[in-house]
Amino acid sequence: MQTLHVELGERSYPIYIGSGLLSRPELLSRHVAGRQVAVVTNETVAPLYLQTLLKSLEGFNVATVVLPDGEAFKNWETLQLIFDGLLTARHDRRTTVVALGGGVIGDMAGFAAACYQRGVDFIQVPTTLLSQVDSSVGGKTGINHPLGKNMVGAFYQPKAVLIDTASLDTLPARELSAGLAEVIKYGLICDEPFLGWLEANMAALRSLDQDALTYAIERSCAAKAQVVGADERESGVRATLNLGHTFGHAIETEQGYGVWLHGEAVAAGTVMALEMSHRLGWISVAERDRGVRLLQAAGLPIVPPRDMTPAQFLEHMAVDKKVLDGQLRLVLLKRLGEAVVTADYPREILDATLRSDYVALAQSFNS
């Protein structure tokens, strides 16, 4: 087992990474202050891992809340089901909420913990690659709004993150690829040597090789922990973690939450960010194509939805959380391994990026 730490003073917490960790009761119990635990999971994960987790929580007063699965349910109505479960079980301020599932479960359970009786402890137990390398670390919690993704939420740090890599054995290939979008992101924004490792090991990652997956998770979490420790509330460098997300969130919102997986939308958005960085003269054609090819090798879409117009992108991007004083800030690449957050770009470059022929770009890789 590998243990990393997110350093936030008195709110610092560990990230445990290894196989079989769901069956190690001491990893959970050391972070549960009271006797009450509320496990929040979904209909897909519950049959696979809920009983294993409950066995590790023997001796505690445990309530379970099983939610419908999918991004389409990341909303107020589903959030209320968590509060209903906590109140029905008479859970008090010393309860600990445990999020067992992917990013949707982690975001909603964390937000519920932040709100319930003005804040109770919670633990992240992510079961998808995307949640293991990204959403479970850093304290971002929340729900979607019909007008924008993740627009309602709070920064609220967990007491611990427990990553059982064995849970990836049951992850569908599409979900695995979606998680790889966030793994690739770390190489693009802050760790160029990692890109070379990913290129050499992509086949192993996609075939669920445990050693390769564990290494990728550890390296991704280490990068995320370092950034969060330096900028917890996204006032500076943490915003670079959103490479591809401004374009990607527009895709998710316009297409309907859950039609594109988050990682799929981020992948297409990352291609657009690479294209814009190239148009600004910051990265070469070869560097752009290297990033796009790696996303393609991960089994991810590299073409935005063909039915989305530039106007539709701009409409959704206008309510992005990185908009400040009416200016749309974007995460772009100065080079592979170095990202910036900037609103200092010619509008015509953004317009050209939105009009680019990504189908032709994709076809050029297959010719």
UniProtKB/Swiss-Prot annotation:
It is found in: Cytoplasm. GO terms for molecular function: 3-dehydroquinate synthase activity; metal ion binding; nucleotide binding. InterPro entries: Dehydroquinate_synthase, DHQ_synth_AroB, DHQ_synth_fam, DHQS/DOIS_N, DHQS_C. The keyword Metal-binding applies. It catalyses: 7-phospho-2-dehydro-3-deoxy-D-arabino-heptonate = 3-dehydroquinate + phosphate. Zn(2+) binds at E182, H245, H262. Its main location: cytoplasm. Keywords: Amino-acid biosynthesis, Aromatic amino acid biosynthesis, Cobalt, Cytoplasm, Lyase, Metal-binding, NAD, Nucleotide-binding, Zinc. CDD domains: DHQS (cd08195). Its EC number is 4.2.3.4. Pathway: Metabolic intermediate biosynthesis; chorismate biosynthesis; chorismate from D-erythrose 4-phosphate and phosphoenolpyruvate: step 2/7. NAD(+) binds at residues 69-74, 103-107, 127-128, 140, 149. One of its GO terms (cellular component) is cytoplasm. Pfam families: DHQ_synthase, DHQS_C. Binds 1 divalent metal cation per subunit. Can use either Co(2+) or Zn(2+). Gene3D superfamilies: 3.40.50.1970, Dehydroquinate synthase-like - alpha domain. One of its GO terms (biological process) is amino acid biosynthetic process. The keyword Zinc applies. Its cofactor is Co(2+); Zn(2+); NAD(+). Belongs to the sugar phosphate cyclases superfamily. Dehydroquinate synthase family. Catalyzes the conversion of 3-deoxy-D-arabino-heptulosonate 7-phosphate (DAHP) to dehydroquinate (DHQ). This is 3-dehydroquinate synthase. It comes from Ectopseudomonas mendocina (strain ymp). The gene is aroB.
